[in-house]
């Protein structure tokens, strides 16, 4: 075959292949169109992407096709049932770590809020950490002076438990410098207190919407729990204080359904002082362990029934659990009266276990450092000093702070009882550290069927930050 014949043969073969490719492409297009028409899907080739936004109560559904987006808004599915929460507390042999946010360590280089008063509360689907921000970030000039408790910049926000209080994952809840929050099985309810000291207002939000308010009745810093409120069969309960921190004040129990207040009652407690109660459900009632900021180094106990009747007194145990406090050996205990005459105090908690009690306290008797939880035999009902178990959570070389209680609902655990849990705040910055700010992180522990070794899950941030050196 001469060269010209070779060229003609190669050209003919190439032309044949080209024609075959064109035919195959045409057939492919025809088949694709026929299949799409038969399936009735039109030209929506891609799958559906669903995004949920924190600030809305709807779901955004985006259907993508080539360069065209079809956006459809649908109602967010809501839970159908209220949580029962009438189960007893589970017996705890020890407390295992549940989460630790390390917010201050992360905040040295991350966008983390300056906060105080963190607490945890759970829905049937998740637990969230709530906290009161100062409207500023760590390592920023606006963090200066955030040792102040009440300001117009403070807001209640939340993240999933274990996350740092960062700007990217936090959800706004309420304008507040004092707060509580809980889930009834259907929606979150928050109570946020804000405004001037002599005319503060508490706004009750339900499902993110303002539903009711409580005006200050004592005109002296209306305030609430700084920990989870308690919902039983759709009714939610919390405790508020209005009046002096260092003498007799006024105390009330509130009851709400779907965020609307349906009942309230004054607590008669002459000679006693109640603040910052840590409450939990137990056998159909609400049990609270509170703070006496007036005289007692023993903690007030409040038990609330669904009809808003109540019993009030003090933790009977012969071991004091407030700070500051005297020596254990010098304390006798009382079920009815404040003892110790130390004044001031710190938010704390306890759990009833039959007649026994698990009670948390700082290790230091005079400052908010270290933290331990102790089990006192018959300590709920008698002046017992029989300490049968102790677990250290933070050693006495490191700062602690507030602490409070919550429970894991049976919807989360699939148990027949409510798991007792607690959190411990670890305050850093002013007045103990050389900084311009005050903030905190937290460790969260939950009750288990086994003994857990003591350790120190302290904050661990290295201070001062760059902003403190300017």
From Swiss-Prot:
* The enzyme's E.C. designation: 3.2.1.18
Instruction: List residues binding Ca(2+).
Output: 292, 296, 322
Top-level EC class, please? hydrolase
Chain residue ranges for the region called Hypervariable stalk region:
32-86
Q: Topology with regard to the membrane?
A: Single-pass type II membrane protein
Q: Where is this region: Head of neuraminidase?
A: 89-470
Q: Quick one: where's region Involved in apical transport and lipid raft association?
A: 11-32
Source domain of life is Viruses
Per the entry, what modulates this protein's activity? Inhibited by the neuraminidase inhibitors zanamivir (Relenza) and oseltamivir (Tamiflu). These drugs interfere with the release of progeny virus from infected cells and are effective against all influenza strains. Resistance to neuraminidase inhibitors is quite rare.
GO MF annotations, alphabetized: exo-alpha-sialidase activity; metal ion binding
A Gene Ontology term for the protein's cellular component: virion membrane
For domains, the record's comment is:
Intact N-terminus is essential for virion morphogenesis. Possesses two apical sorting signals, one in the ectodomain, which is likely to be a glycan, and the other in the transmembrane domain. The transmembrane domain also plays a role in lipid raft association.
Question: What protein am I looking at?
Answer: Neuraminidase
The source organism is Influenza A virus (strain A/Equine/Kentucky/1/1981)
User: What is the taxonomic lineage of the source species?
Assistant: Viruses, Riboviria, Orthornavirae, Negarnaviricota, Polyploviricotina
């Amino acid at each position: 075959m001469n060269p010209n014949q070779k060229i003609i043969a190669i050209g003919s073969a190439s032309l044949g292949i080209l024609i075959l490719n064109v035919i195959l492409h045409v057939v492919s297009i025809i088949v694709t169109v026929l299949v799409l028409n038969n399936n009735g899907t039109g030209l929506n080739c891609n799958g559906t992407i669903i995004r949920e936004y924190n600030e809305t109560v709807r779901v955004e559904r985006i259907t993508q096709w080539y360069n065209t987006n079809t956006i459809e808004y649908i109602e967010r599915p809501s839970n159908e049932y209220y949580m029962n929460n009438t189960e007893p507390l589970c017996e705890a042999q020890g407390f295992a770590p549940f989460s630790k946010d390390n917010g201050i360590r992360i905040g040295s280089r991350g966008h983390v809020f300056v906060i105080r008063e963190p607490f945890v509360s759970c829905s049937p689907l998740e637990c969230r950490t709530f906290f009161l921000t100062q409207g500023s970030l760590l390592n920023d000039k606006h963090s200066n002076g955030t040792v102040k408790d009440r300001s117009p910049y403070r807001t209640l926000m939340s993240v999933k438990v274990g996350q740092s209080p960062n700007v990217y994952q936090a959800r706004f809840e309420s304008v507040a410098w004092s707060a509580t929050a809980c889930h009834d099985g259907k929606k979150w309810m928050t109570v946020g207190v804000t405004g001037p000291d002599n005319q503060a207002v508490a706004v009750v939000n339900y499902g993110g919407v303002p539903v009711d308010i409580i005006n200050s009745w004592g005109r002296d810093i209306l305030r609430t729990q700084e920990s989870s409120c308690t919902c039983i069969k759709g009714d939610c309960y919390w405790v508020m204080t209005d009046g002096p921190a260092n003498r007799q004040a006024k105390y009330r129990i509130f009851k709400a359904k779907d965020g609307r207040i349906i009942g309230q009652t004054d607590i008669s407690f002459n000679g006693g002082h109640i603040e910052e109660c840590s409450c939990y459900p137990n056998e159909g009632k609400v049990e609270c362990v509170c703070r006496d900021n007036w005289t007692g180094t023993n903690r007030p106990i409040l038990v609330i029934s669904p009809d808003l009747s109540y019993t009030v007194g003090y933790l009977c145990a012969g071991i004091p659990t407030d700070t500051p406090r005297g020596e254990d050996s010098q304390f006798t205990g009382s079920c009815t009266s404040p003892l110790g005459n130390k004044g001031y105090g710190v938010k704390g908690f306890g759990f009833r276990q039959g007649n026994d009690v698990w009670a948390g306290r700082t290790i230091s008797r005079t400052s908010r450092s270290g933290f331990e939880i102790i089990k006192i035999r018959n300590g709920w009902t008698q002046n017992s000093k029989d300490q049968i178990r102790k677990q250290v959570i933070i050693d006495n070389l490191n700062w602690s702070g507030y602490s409070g209680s919550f429970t894991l609902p049976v919807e989360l655990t699939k148990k027949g009882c409510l798991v007792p849990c607690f959190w411990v705040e670890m305050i850093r910055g002013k007045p103990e550290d050389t900084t311009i700010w005050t903030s905190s992180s937290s460790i969260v522990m939950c009750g288990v069927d086994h003994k857990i070794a003591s350790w120190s899950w302290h904050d661990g941030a290295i201070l001062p930050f760059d902003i403190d050196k300017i």
